[in-house]
Amino acid sequence: MVEHLFSGSGVCVVDGAGGLLLPAFVRETISRRSAAHRLLIGSHESDPCLVAYDPGFVSTIHADVERRRIAEQAVSPQLHFMRARRAFGFVESADVAAGRIVLPELMRRRAHIAQLALLVGTGGAVAIWDARIALDHGDADLHELAAFYIDRQQAA
């Protein structure tokens, strides 16, 4: 059971090297969940964004992949391999130093993250969106979050 969940949202300016200062809700949760001071960053299964989580969450992801493999193996065994590649092969590590990370270039490119990243807690992980993509293509709640943070950033 995960005791400390990622709950909250925030926006971060992304520098030219992909560096960003994590919002307080992410920094606080990481410090409670892991002494590793790093995040694993991978591609979201269905949305055009990234997911970030501490190394201890990998076992939860593995259990979910296995549960779904068993449930879907008669329908399409290929689904499992695609899901497993995305969950475990399309992942990179980012060190957390002084509350900052550098998004790996491959991950930034995959999610088209440019100058402003929207981070949204999803319980065991954090979704990382390009704020403009979230505004233009997200569901109603995501659109509202992105609009709020973009407006706030522009007013600053």
Name each model feature, range by range:
Residues 1-32:
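The feature marks the first
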Residues 4-6, 34, 87, 111-112:
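Short solvent-exposed loop/turn micro-motifs enriched in small/polar/acidic residues
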Residues 18-22, 26, 52, 99-103, ...:
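Short, structured motif recognition centered on aromatic/hydrophobic residues
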Residues 25-70:
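Acidic (E/D-rich), amphipathic helical modules within compact regulatory domains
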Residues 32-47, 109-134:
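A short beta-strand-loop micro-motif that forms or neighbors metal/cofactor-
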Residues 55, 60-61, 66-101, 106-108, ...:
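Short, solvent-exposed interaction modules
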Residues 124-156:
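Glycine-rich, aromatic-bearing surface loops/beta-hairpins
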